[in-house]
Amino acid sequence: MLARISRRFSVKLSLPGYKTKNIDENILPKEAETNFEELKDCLTDMMKIRRIEIVADNLYKSGKIRGFLHLSDGQEALAKGLSLALTDEDPLITFYRDHGHAYMRGVSAHEIFGELLGKSTGNAKGKGGSMHFYNEETGFYGGYGIVGENIPIGAGLAFALKYKHKNNVAAITFGDGACNQGQLYEAANMCSLWKLPALFLIENNCYGMGTSVVRASANTQLYTRGDNADIPGIRVDGQDVFAVKELIKFSKDYALEKGPLWIELRTYRYHGHSMSDPDISYREKEEIQEI
């Protein structure tokens, strides 16, 4: 009886604050309402993503996975939050740290590990590897291996949506390191000029490879970097699944009416940049433990 009653509850959660540029913070969501089933769903999926990454780590270290491998453990709330706010009709395009996004867009764990192990049962028949998952049926346009190369393609997806009068947005994710890539700002300028329904989503995990944001960017307030293209910016806690969900829901409506938004999702990766990164020369273990 108690178990049945507990499943009926709903709760309102206060969301963490935002940092904004050229957009009124007062119009942003301040709370989220959730229930037992959604909480269970969130925890289940985030734990599955974490488990996929940890198992992949072990398989790589045992020599069964070869080539490149970029893990996203620590960033599970970001992938899950996006999936709660977007539909399969909203194209999502990302970069090489793509396992969590792929899983949330319908690529099964069986397909993920088949691909990582180079088997024909993999998502790309074992030919793409870690950085090139995709799922055309669910609007997941893949991971890309070169920093920033997915962004102009994402702008093209946004253009196609507007051209075809679709009521959807293109979600373009990239890391803090890509914020210093020229093609990002070329794509942003075009999206702003034509008022395309694009969300520029920065997965700021604080490090581009082994270089801290403060050592790589003159302006470390990444949510302000769309200003030159006249794109409003917002920073949110990317470790809070409901903060991500509610902001992206708001952003989708905003982009459909007014054009692109520039969003910095503050997150953190527990592993190094890739499996070749010993992760001991540029940050202390205490930093990871504190997070």
Predicted features and spans:
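Cofactor-binding active-site loop characterized by glycine-rich and histidine/acidic residues
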Residues: 57, 62-194, 212-218, 223, ...
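Flexible, glycine/charged-enriched surface loops at secondary-structure junctions
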Residues: 55-57, 170, 258-262
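Conserved phosphate-handling catalytic cores of large alpha/beta enzymes
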Residues: 206, 212-262, 267
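A short, conserved beta-to-alpha structural element at the edge of catalytic cores
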Residues: 194-214
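Flexible loop/turn segments at secondary-structure boundaries
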Residues: 100-102, 179-180, 207-210, 242-243, ...
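Short acidic (Asp/Glu) and glycine-rich catalytic loops that position anionic groups and cofactors
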Residues: 21-23, 59-61, 89-94, 203-204, ...
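N-terminal amphipathic, basic-rich helices that act as targeting or association modules
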Residues: 2-5, 9-97, 105
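Glycine/aspartate-rich loop-and-adjacent alpha/beta segment that forms the canonical ThDP
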Residues: 11-25, 254-291
